[in-house]
Each structure stands twice: as C-alpha cells, then as structure tokens.
Curated annotation (Swiss-Prot):
It comes from the Eukaryota. The chain crosses the membrane at residues 40-60, 72-92. It is found in: Membrane. It is a multi-pass membrane protein. This is Putative uncharacterized protein YJL067W. Keywords: Membrane, Transmembrane, Transmembrane helix.
Length: 116
C-alpha cells in the first residue's frame, strides 16, 4: 500500500543581494548582520541561502504557505517579491530542511544537490 504524500516545491528566488540586505537587514529586524536576515527568513518558511548568498531557498507549503499575513515579517516577505529578478518553482523528490542555526554564508547544500 503506497502512502500518499503531499508534493512539495523548492522556491528559488533570485534577488539583488545588496537590495535584499537593505530591506531585511535594517529597521525592526536590527542591524545588517546576515544572521538577522536568515532568522527572519526562517520564520516565513524559508530555510536557507545558497553558499553565495544570491538565492533564497524555501519550501512552499501549499498555496497559502508562502508568507504569513497581517504582520511585519509578512509585509517584508511580500516586499521581496517586488524586487525579484527571476523566480522559478520546481518539484523535488525529497524534503529539504536546514537547521535554524545555518549561517547566511555557511555551508549550505549546493543547488544541484536539491534536484538529484
């Protein structure tokens, strides 16, 4: 008997890193440190940057799981999409989760490894 599994997607968003830092690394989130940026993303269902810091990688949890509504992080998350240079959604065969202690420029898995 095969167990039905909900299909998950990796969302890869290419943004201008400097612009992104200006949006997420200041104001309420405090400072310009990469770890502040990362923690904010974790809270809105994004799990890591790639090693170069140019991509955000996250899991879409159904159609409504992209970003929270009616809060500050939600509005920041939506503002990211106003500066997106390119967006692509692709299916994956396995779940991808990284530790919340993962650093912005830490040793995240390569993008290629996600799609094997």
């Amino acid at each position: 008997m095969s167990k039905k599994r909900k299909r998950k997607y990796v969302l890869i968003v290419f943004v201008n890193t400097h612009h992104f830092m200006l949006h997420l690394g200041t104001g309420t989130l405090g400072g310009s440190g990469g770890s502040n940026v990362y923690r904010a993303i974790v809270k809105v269902d994004f799990f890591s940057f790639d090693g170069a810091g140019f991509c955000i990688i996250g899991i879409l949890r159904g159609t409504n799981g992209l970003c929270p509504s009616n809060n500050f992080l939600g509005s920041i998350c939506r503002s990211i999409f106003s500066i997106v240079a390119q967006m692509q959604v692709v299916p994956i065969q396995h779940e991808v989760f990284w530790s919340s202690s993962q650093r912005l420029y830490g040793s995240a898995p390569s993008l290629d490894s996600l799609f094997l």
